């Protein structure tokens, strides 16, 4: 899968921009741009750009091909988990909805047409290992999101069972905050909270087993869900990508340390060496950090989905 032109920001005249996130640009698709046989309903065009964020700040330098690789990983998992949970993808090709004059090759592998859903206003996080903000919370309180954990656990230790730890859904530039399940219930209601929790853990267990067969540990992951007009629950946005998940090479896993991961760790490590306040604007990245990060995304895509990047 050759990587095409780098895309930092998508501009599609005739498609109203609904949201520009840290990585994805989301456009409403007017009815007259849809194929005549499209089922009734509202649809979105979701574009994965090559933007990179770290510490909740979008950095000025993109990672070439990152959006295509993220989209490929997401699509792989959406199709792989259809038996577990419906997803937001629909059977409408990207080139069918693009405005005239836009090169479809630029968007073919980095964009998808999706159902327009009502987002559940909580990030759904599954954790199988004690790392990241979960490790920090455990050190401080012995708990993660109100869940009591055994004493004496070490950094990166596998948890007795995967746990569901929701968080707030922050705006671009703000920080998500871990919340307990009771707080989620107050936000979305008990019935929906339980459906999201059950789906999150069910998908995590399936994906963790699949990744383990390929020599990769899925330490944790974050999902987003949405509902349609009839209250049906769908998984949406991105799925099990290196941006939303912490993947570790199993052969480099060592208890008590933070294992290397298939993500933007090279970027985070570099930024930690700078005198930077972790607020916008972010600093420029050296070419070697960009290339090493791109290679990590490409390796994750190849090992998980069997798709090679030239």
Swiss-Prot record:
<dbReference type="InterPro" id="IPR028923">
    <property type="entry name" value="SAICAR_synt/ADE2_N"/>
</dbReference>
<comment type="pathway">
    <text>Purine metabolism; IMP biosynthesis via de novo pathway; 5-amino-1-(5-phospho-D-ribosyl)imidazole-4-carboxamide from 5-amino-1-(5-phospho-D-ribosyl)imidazole-4-carboxylate: step 1/2.</text>
</comment>
<dbReference type="GO" id="GO:0005524">
    <property type="term" value="F:ATP binding"/>
</dbReference>
<dbReference type="InterPro" id="IPR018236">
    <property type="entry name" value="SAICAR_synthetase_CS"/>
</dbReference>
<protein>
    <recommendedName>
        <fullName>Phosphoribosylaminoimidazole-succinocarboxamide synthase</fullName>
        <ecNumber>6.3.2.6</ecNumber>
    </recommendedName>
</protein>
<dbReference type="GO" id="GO:0005737">
    <property type="term" value="C:cytoplasm"/>
</dbReference>
<dbReference type="GO" id="GO:0004639">
    <property type="term" value="F:phosphoribosylaminoimidazolesuccinocarboxamide synthase activity"/>
</dbReference>
<keyword id="KW-0658">Purine biosynthesis</keyword>
<keyword id="KW-0067">ATP-binding</keyword>
<dbReference type="Pfam" id="PF01259">
    <property type="entry name" value="SAICAR_synt"/>
</dbReference>
<keyword id="KW-0436">Ligase</keyword>
<dbReference type="GO" id="GO:0006189">
    <property type="term" value="P:'de novo' IMP biosynthetic process"/>
</dbReference>
<dbReference type="InterPro" id="IPR001636">
    <property type="entry name" value="SAICAR_synth"/>
</dbReference>
<comment type="similarity">
    <text>Belongs to the SAICAR synthetase family.</text>
</comment>
<keyword id="KW-0547">Nucleotide-binding</keyword>
